Amino acid sequence: MTNSDGTGRFIVFEGGEGSGKSTQATRLAERLGAVLTRQPGGTELGGQLRSLLLDSDAMVSDRTEALLMAADRAQHADELIRPALAAGRHVVCDRYTGSSIAYQGHGRGLDPADVAMLSAWATDELSPELVVLLRVDQDTAA
C-alpha cells in the first residue's frame, strides 16, 4: 500500500521475547501491503551483524554491542526504511530503538540516554509514527 501524498508510514513493534511482536508485525505488513523488516538484520550488512551478535563465541563488549546495533540501524534507515517511505510505502519493523534502550541500555548497564542518543544520531533522528508495545506475562511468553 502507498499513500497518495508520497510518504509512507513507519510503524514499529516492540516487546519482550515471545510477546508475539514478529507475528503481529507480519500480519499488519501483509494487511497493509507494507515493507516488513526487522532489526537487527534488515539489510545484508544487518544480517552479518545479527549473526555476529547472536554468536555466543564472539567476545563483544557491551559498548561494542551498542555500536554494532547503531551501525545496523544506520544502514537499515539509509538503505531500506527511508527509500521505502519516500516511495510512499508503509514500513513495519520488528524492533527498533526501544529494543536497544532495553537491551544495551538497561540490560547491559549502559546509560539508556547514551544509547538513545546514539540511535538518534545513527538514524538521523528517523522516528516511527507509531510504536506498538506488546506486553505479556512470562507464562504467556514461555
Where are these regions (language model features)?
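Conserved lysine of the Walker
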Residues: 21
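Conserved phosphate-donor/acceptor-positioning beta-strand/loop module used by diverse small-molecule
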Residues: 93-95, 124-142
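Hydrophobic anchor at the beta1->P-loop junction of P-loop NTPases
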Residues: 13
